[in-house]
Amino acid sequence: MTTIVSVRRNGQVVVGGDGQVSLGNTVMKGNARKVRRLYNGKVLAGFAGGTADAFTLFELFERKLEMHQGHLLKSAVELAKDWRTDRALRKLEAMLIVADEKESLIITGIGDVVQPEEDQILAIGSGGNYALSAARALVENTELSAREIVEKSLRIAGDICVFTNTNFTIEELPN
């Protein structure tokens, strides 16, 4: 798996992820780019799960963004509907965190769309709970920027989770 974490703080949203691709208990690649910009750089997206499945979902989600003029929630709900009803899509094993300047969402592998708690922190993947815990502690107890919190949370997850490394891709809005 992997770790993807998103933090929204002081008018900035940051999504970061590690670069490890595993096949069973073997590391296949250490520098995969699991966080991307979509919709002309206005939407950040990060994936956890099967790489091929995630790229399929990135492509489908970007189409939904185009269809709905970049409206994040509407695009996510429409993708989730397709995910639940299309036989081929139902077999995809991946989760997405998506964010724009206004909101952040998780799109789950069963076609659910989840909004964050009041703290505006999201995390997915095998190291997601470690990163989520770290980010919450840092938000509550420090004045660090959203980017610094994402970096530190990913580093903590990478130190604990064997399916997460410390080769990060981090994107932020506004940039």
Swiss-Prot record:
The active site is at T2. Allosterically activated by HslU binding. One of its GO terms (molecular function) is threonine-type endopeptidase activity. GO terms for cellular component: HslUV protease complex; proteasome core complex. It is an enzyme of class 3 (hydrolase). GO terms for biological process: proteolysis involved in protein catabolic process. Coiled coil: none annotated. Its EC number is 3.4.25.2. It comes from the Bacteria. The keyword RNA-binding does not apply. It catalyses: ATP-dependent cleavage of peptide bonds with broad specificity. Its main location: cytoplasm. The keyword Metal-binding applies. InterPro entries: ATP-dep_Prtase_HsIV_su (IPR022281), Ntn_hydrolases_N (IPR029055), Proteasome_sua/b (IPR001353), Proteasome_suB-type (IPR023333). A double ring-shaped homohexamer of HslV is capped on each side by a ring-shaped HslU homohexamer. The assembly of the HslU/HslV complex is dependent on binding of ATP. Protease subunit of a proteasome-like degradation complex believed to be a general protein degrading machinery. This is ATP-dependent protease subunit HslV. The gene is hslV.
